[in-house]
Design a protein with these regions (language model features):
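Alpha-helical support elements that line or immediately flank enzyme active sites
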Residues: 158-169
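Active-site-lining helix/loop region of Rossmann-like oxidoreductase modules
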Residues: 24-25, 168-296, 305-309, 332
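Rossmann-fold NAD(P)-binding glycine/threonine-rich loop
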Residues: 103-104, 112, 120-147
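N-terminal glycine-/serine-/threonine-rich beta1-alpha1-beta2 phosphate-ribose binding loop
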Residues: 2-112, 232
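C-terminal helical cap and adjacent loop that interface with cofactors, partners, or active-site loops
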Residues: 290-291, 298-372
Length: 372
């Protein structure tokens, strides 16, 4: 270990200097976290990683839509970024389809003394649930560098951990928990990953990645297990279910064009079975147009999307959360929220004990510096 958490501890806790941060990738999520890092007085951008050659050498401000140059230019040199010995790297590069590469990149930072806050490798939203092939090398890197890694977002993440825990704090008894994302994805520009993973624009006989046995549980089973551990109950089994809805007419949307007979909506869930009943359920209902699958659950008040928690208990509780406003599309707002969840956690992660952590290991409040 060259620089571990202890080296930067006095500076972090003394408040004399901003935390030095690297942004890794500038795609859908990364451009928003990059902008947030630049604009926050408690953070100092010291490096930016870009995957595409057309972004290398460009100023960070240009890559996230800001006018005033930062003097920090994007690079694809991993070793140079690791050598900066930053306090934290915000890792938003798409990793689920390239986990081996992502592991190499992330472990390089962790081993060298740089903490990691991420929005990808979503299996790590609750590390105890993650498979050993992923968890073990990262944990070893944390031990070597004296560093911490935290992965979260809006879903998986906020909607399946912080939101239901807030609702549960108001109950005296909970019989079941339902967490839902119900969203029109039509304006979401992510055909290459979300489109392919969900099977949008394919015929129902083609099984998308998400619906392969075990994949849903590997992702949303983490939040199920986190809630079970918080509640002190044992999940006997995790069940997966999924179904599709095909278009009747041609659908034109930002993500793609869907022909009649092709998948335009999906509904899937992971059910945590406790004492023989589905007690903790994570469900998605995602459409490429609000007119698709009218028989499935829809957001309230005609909204395009909702993250919802329903507690069946004493008392019963339902919380509906919506992102976006008159100036920001709900899908774009969801991406901004995902980026914010990572950036807002930087200080807490830098102050946390070394290792792979989840929401359970961090303070509830991570909002300092937001009102400006």
């Amino acid at each position: 270990m060259i620089f571990g958490k202890g080296v930067f501890g006095a500076r972090i806790h003394g408040g004399q200097m901003p935390l030095r941060v690297i942004q890794f990738s500038t795609g859908n999520v990364g451009r928003h976290s990059l902008r947030s890092i630049i604009q926050r007085p408690d953070l100092e951008l010291v490096g930016v990683h870009a995957n595409s050659s057309d972004k290398v050498g460009r100023d960070a401000a240009e890559l996230c839509g800001l006018a005033e140059p930062t003097g920090v230019v994007a690079t694809d040199d991993l070793d140079a970024l690791v050598a900066l010995r930053a306090d934290c790297v915000v890792y938003t590069s798409q990793a689920e389809t390239r986990p081996d590469v992502a592991l190499k990149e992330i472990t390089a930072f962790l081993s060298a003394g740089t903490n990691v806050v991420g929005t990808s490798l979503v299996w790590l939203v609750y590390p105890p649930h993650a498979d050993a092939w992923l968890r073990d090398p990262l944990a070893a890197a944390c031990a070597e560098g004296g560093t911490t890694m935290y992965v979260n977002g809006i879903d998986p993440g906020f909607s399946g951990d912080l939101l239901p825990l807030a609702a549960l704090s108001l109950t005296e008894r909970a019989e079941s928990i339902l967490v839902q994302e119900i969203c029109d994805y039509g304006s979401y520009d992510d055909a290459e990953f979300t489109g392919v993973s969900f099977g949008f624009g394919t015929t129902p006989d083609i099984v998308p990645t998400l619906f392969l046995p075990g994949v849903l549980a590997s992702i949303w089973g983490g939040p199920v297990q986190l809630l079970a551990d918080e509640l002190g109950v044992v999940v006997d089994e995790m069940r997966e279910r999924h179904e599709t809805w095909t278009a009747v007419d041609t659908i034109e949307c930002t993500m793609m064009t869907v022909a009649p007979g092709e998948v335009a909506a999906v509904r899937f869930a992971v059910e945590g079975i406790v004492d023989g009943r589905p007690a903790i359920v994570m469900e998605h209902v995602n459409r490429l147009t609000s007119a698709a699958a009218p028989e499935w659950p829809v957001p309230p008040e005609g909204r395009p999307g909702v993250h919802r928690v329903v507690i069946n208990g004493t008392p019963g509780i339902e919380i509906n959360t919506h992102v976006g406003n008159d100036h920001t599309d709900h899908n774009e707002a969801g991406v901004i929220a995902t980026a914010a969840k990572a950036v807002n956690a930087i200080a807490a992660v830098c102050a946390a004990p070394p290792g792979l952590i989840s929401l359970r290991d961090l303070p509830v409040s991570q909002v300092r510096g937001l009102m400006r």
